[in-house]
Amino acid sequence: MEKFTLVTFYHFVQLENYEDMRDELLSCCIEKGLKGTVLLALEGINGSVAGHDGEIRDFLDFVRRDERLRGLEWKESYTNFQPFQEMKVRLKKEIVALGCAELENMEICETGEYVEPEDWSSLIAREDVKTIDTRNLYETKLGRFKYSIDPETINFRDFQEWVRKWIEKDNVSMEQKIAMYCTGGVRCEKSTAYMKRIGFKNVYQLKGGIINYFLKTKNKDGAWVGDCFVFDDRVAVNVDLEPIQLKCLECSCVVNTDDLKNIPRGRVLCSGCGQNTTRFS
């Protein structure tokens, strides 16, 4: 059976020539038969790429030849099918779009304190800690950590508005201990930096995100409930990082990532049933 290695990575660093990097990076990926998506912006690089193991190693070596990216770290998982349809390298304003102008240079922004996966469950179980899931509704409906607050955002850009309303509604103190998590860690870099920027003093983030938590702990403490949405053709994985099959609640056909992202309120519906639900609601 054919086996594919999937790597996810991000690195915040000023890439003044990021537009010039695109063609060379895309050519490298195509030459090595890789598929996935890489985002390039002035603030850094963010990507998920899959292929045969040797070619993935060559790709990572190629990326890290750039001295600005030598500190690039990545997470690996494995699958018996290619989880991407094509190879794309895109130029963006941000590698993860929070839309906060004050965070344009992440290299000089103060982010949340990293918490190792092995220490995460004990942190979020504390009564003096508020845990926030920074992902979107279509993701959180599939699974999340116990004790966590679900902002029910449709888009990551909505997160700032939710925070402002949450502070006002619950009269949240800037001394409140805040623990935050996302799928792979990159959204927490931005969201924890935002929380620090507006005045929160005790902000923590799960190092490497949910995927790293699965890799390192296998959820042995049972802090995670459900499955984890991923942005590729696996759609969702369990705590062993094995793909699961999600079926439409109405017609039982297998749903894909676009179905889930486009259905309101995070229900597991195919696009056809989702359109009918929207039309008659």
Swiss-Prot record:
Biological processes per GO annotation: tRNA modification
Keyword tRNA processing: yes
EC number(s) given by UniProt: 1.14.-.-
Catalytic activity: uridine(34) in tRNA + AH2 + O2 = 5-hydroxyuridine(34) in tRNA + A + H2O
Catalytic residues of the enzyme: 182 (cysteine persulfide intermediate)
Keywords, comma-separated and alphabetical: Oxidoreductase, tRNA processing
Record-annotated Rhodanese domain positions: 125-222
GO MF terms held by the record: oxidoreductase activity, acting on paired donors, with incorporation or reduction of molecular oxygen
SMART domains listed in its UniProt record: RHOD
One Pfam family matching this protein: Rhodanese
Free-text function comment from the UniProt entry: Catalyzes oxygen-dependent 5-hydroxyuridine (ho5U) modification at position 34 in tRNAs.
HAMAP family, alphabetized: TrhO
Family affiliation: Belongs to the TrhO family.
Name of this chain's protein: tRNA uridine(34) hydroxylase
Source organism of the structure: Neorickettsia sennetsu (strain ATCC VR-367 / Miyayama)
Primary gene name: trhO
